[in-house]
Design a protein with these regions (language model features):
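N-terminal leader/signal peptides at the extreme start of proteins
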Residues: 1-30
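Residue-level marker of intrinsically disordered, low-complexity segments enriched
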Residues: 2-3, 18, 31, 35-40, ...
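Compositionally biased, low-structure terminal segments
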Residues: 4-6, 31, 295, 321-322
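Compositionally biased, low-complexity segments
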Residues: 6, 13-15, 43, 301, ...
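Short hydrophobic "helix-edge" motifs at membrane interfaces and signal-peptide entry regions
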Residues: 24, 41, 249-250
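Amphipathic alpha-helical segments typified by the pilin-like N-terminal helix
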Residues: 27-67
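Short, well-structured segments within or immediately adjacent to enzyme catalytic domains
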Residues: 66, 70-336
Length: 336
């Protein structure tokens, strides 16, 4: 009996300390000072990286802008390859003047591919709209990634059904494509410019001699817009939206496409490689955003062969072409 009792009481008693988990080691956290130091370092790194990132983004936009311009010119060249004279697209040769005696009973009628050039159609809106209708360019590439002027917007609802050359009154492009860069935003449905890009003014010797697929590597054909009449001082320069296209923002720079399709980022409205001479005027650098109106020397001014890139509006006539005066960043029209 005593043995049995002793056996029952010989079981080991559990150690009370075994059921208590070990106390974790104390961990030291950040002090307020250390946290502020980390935040300051992160802020410093961000301040250093953001400008570099911004510059990289702007450089990428400049490259994409040049690609747009090159692609537009390639569309022009594709059109020129189907023209017997190698002419770049000319709206007045698409929508021509009616032909006397071509209609029933000898009436005057519009005949596709026939008739004299309708010079009044040779403005910027008709040029680009006719190219979209013929699928040589798209509305997307006519809007620049570096655009800053709020009046300029990509056209997203181009009416391809407007192309109807077989209609009794033929139409060849959407007339709702506008290039009214001179208007103020909110001034009506037509107060919009659906393209960012200027082109060689379609008038005079410059059109006759250089609006072709043989223009060469020193002849500008199209590109970024310039300051009003090629200004390089005063408010017409300082307040121009075109100064905001590329870096730096306080000087004008622009992508320009030449006749051989190469695109160069020019640093001045008077590029080193673009020159012109006429009559007794010696070879000189050419301001590519205005026609050279020499006081003497036998030059013909607006109808000469010098480079003049602009956005043309209205209805051109043989001796006059209207270049749209783009509003300044303060909303005012540029000084004449």
């Amino acid at each position: 009996m005593d043995c049995m009792f002793a056996h029952r009481n010989s079981r080991p008693h559990p150690d009370p300390s075994a059921s208590v988990p070990p106390r974790p080691a104390w961990r030291r956290g950040f002090t307020l000072v250390e946290l502020l130091v980390v935040v300051a370092i992160i802020a410093l790194l961000i301040s250093l990286l953001l400008p570099a990132l911004g510059r990289a983004q702007r450089a990428a936009k400049t490259l994409n802008d040049a690609a747009n311009i090159s692609q537009i010119h390639k569309g022009f060249l594709s059109h020129a390859n189907s023209d017997p004279k190698g002419r770049l697209p000319t709206p007045g040769l698409v929508s021509r003047l009616p032909v006397p005696g071509a209609g029933p009973g000898g009436a005057t009628a519009t005949v596709p591919g026939q008739g004299e050039e309708d010079i009044s159609k040779n403005n910027t809106a008709s040029l680009y709209s006719s190219m979209i209708a013929a699928n040589f360019v798209t509305p997307e590439i006519l809007y620049s990634p570096v655009e800053e002027n709020p009046i300029v917007r990509q056209m997203t609802n181009y009416n391809f059904q407007a192309y109807n050359p077989a209609a009794p009154a033929p139409t060849f492009w959407d007339p709702g494509f506008y290039a009214n860069i001179h208007l103020a935003p909110g001034a009506g449905a037509s107060a919009v410019c659906h393209t960012s890009y200027a082109h060689l003014a379609l008038i005079g010797d410059r059109k006759k001699l250089y609006w072709t697929n043989r223009a060469g590597s020193t002849r500008p054909i199209l590109g970024n817009r310039g300051t009003h009449r090629g200004a390089f001082s005063g408010d017409n320069y300082r307040l121009s939206y075109t100064l905001l296209f590329h870096d730096p923002k306080d000087t004008w720079e622009g992508n320009i496409c030449f006749g051989d399709n190469h695109v160069n980022l020019e640093k001045s409205v008077i590029p080193d490689t673009v020159q012109f001479e006429c009559g007794s005027i010696n070879l000189k650098k050419d301001n590519i955003y205005t026609y050279d109106d020499f006081n003497s020397g036998g030059c013909k001014g607006m109808v000469e062969g010098d480079t003049w890139l602009c956005i043309g509006i209205g209805q051109p006539v043989p001796n006059f072409y209207t270049c749209a005066p783009e509003r300044l960043t303060n909303g005012a029209l540029p000084a004449p």
